[in-house]
């Protein structure tokens, strides 16, 4: 059997497309159970698979799926993530209208269609973003895909795909929705350059990128909600940006963090009167986010935003406490309750005599706690079974 599998791997670069297709189909399951098969001859099978991403549709789909599964391996990840030409292949397929097949003979009509494997490509980009080398995409420029974006910046183009492509808005093929790009943004926001991008108004559309993402904290897609929640938390580590994040004329982040945490509970008129308008008189069928981890992430972001005295005073002024109190009472999860407790302790404490130096200590403590949890998230690789 091992010799037969080795022979099958050799067929990945066979000149006959039918043989390449059969090889991909039969090797797919082994990309999880026996990934070492693809690491022979200095990763030659991986290099073959990179080329097959541009092959006929059924071959390309299986090649992408195999690469998704293999990219959890550090050596394979390095091979994929550091390849500029391969990154451009993925970007051009995910951002523009292209042909899904190799060119037909001269004189043969060929109908261009939308890329049918958007979901697989964005899953692969999600895994590539685990590599530090992938952050070069933050400053990468390329040709403008006019059907999708008006910017030459690759990250702007991915943002536009994410915004316009939800629910098949750009690409109806195979229910393409670009949801997995939320995880790409979350990984990029861990870098200083990434946070700077999300907080800087972009020239091509005069919009601050993070304001495009906040609206997805209550989206029906769990992937979007989770990725955006992590992105917002990472952005909140930029303490100097807290005034911009909190201001109604800026990002106005508070409602987007509090709404997923809020449930259908009723508050007294006195409590409601001081709350943000979006949090007042919520309907009786209002539901909290169904994922306790996402709620915990929003609580961590809120805690980070209490690093400055101005942030704490704003949260007190808009009566955040009752919302957190009800979350503590109604979410049956120890981690969520601990997050509520930490936030309430900060909001309810006496500010008298507090020195500004305490803010640095609070941020350092928060970073230590959150980065410990983030280390586990970093190891999570998307796999397709």
Question: Model-derived features: where do they sit?
Answer:
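Positions within the helices of HEAT/ARM-like alpha-solenoid repeats
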Residues: 18-22, 58-60, 101-103, 113-117, ...
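N-terminal "cap/leader" segments of large eukaryotic alpha-helical scaffolds
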Residues: 1-51, 56, 251, 260-264, ...
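Structured C-terminal portions of repeat-based eukaryotic scaffold domains
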Residues: 201, 212, 219, 223, ...
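Alpha-solenoid helical repeat architecture
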Residues: 11-15, 52-56, 94-98, 109-112, ...
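Elongated alpha-helical scaffolds that mediate protein-protein interactions in large eukaryotic proteins
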Residues: 1-47, 60-61, 70-89, 97, ...
